[in-house]
Amino acid sequence: MTQSGAAIAARGIRKSFVEHTVLDDVDLEVDQGTIFALLGPNGAGKTTIVKILSTLLRPDAGTATVAGFDVATHPADVRESISLTGQFAAVDEILSGRENLVLMARLRRVKDAGQIADDLLARFQLTDAATRRVATYSGGMRRRLDIAMSLIGNPPVIFLDEPTTGLDPQARIEVWNSVKELAGQGTTVLLTTQYLDEAEQLADRIAILHEGRIIVNGTLAELKQLLPPAKVEYVEKQPTLEDIFLAIVGTAGKDGNAGNEAASAPTSKEQR
């Protein structure tokens, strides 16, 4: 590991494409077994830093280590220590969920591929859908399967590049629960996102990347301290759309029974 004990450490990372500077002197450090959210709008450089840390792209300047290995001098060791999940689930839709996992385990030359597949299916609540073709899975199920596949071989570090892009609210919550479980099992997670609520829900630490630079880095509590105290006035709280959605759907949305136990909104006739 690095001297600081960090699972991921980057110092002075710079990257330009032609005359456009994408990353400008980026520093970051991620402790072992934590979730670190890199927050920023499209084009901020989030995917570029992930590519550099996962050895897919060389920086123009700076140094980085992942799981104790330098990404420039020991790229093979870095790749053995990580898993990368991109913005869209990289699963074979023709195969079943279990077949996808078994295939990945065999590609990684892991023993007991079938048992590992069954364990991961149970861990990510996919056992009932194990033999179904992935083409029939919902977006949330596909993403959970994708994350499960990334755990084969027990990599200590996982990069999740905008893992909930294109998912509906219920599917996003399913993925959030899976990500929280990863950290609970000791896996280090670097998560990129442009969703503020996602970073707030998941991250132990949050860094904001803007125009290629880290402009703030800290815990949620530390970031809140950057703002002046809010003036408190009594306002009757109205439920948000998210409150309504979660109250109606809850966990029942996973099996298609959403709303069976929820109160229905009154019709115009009932209102009269």
Task: Give the role of each language-model region.
Residues G62-T73, D77-V78:
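Conserved ABC transporter NBD signature motif
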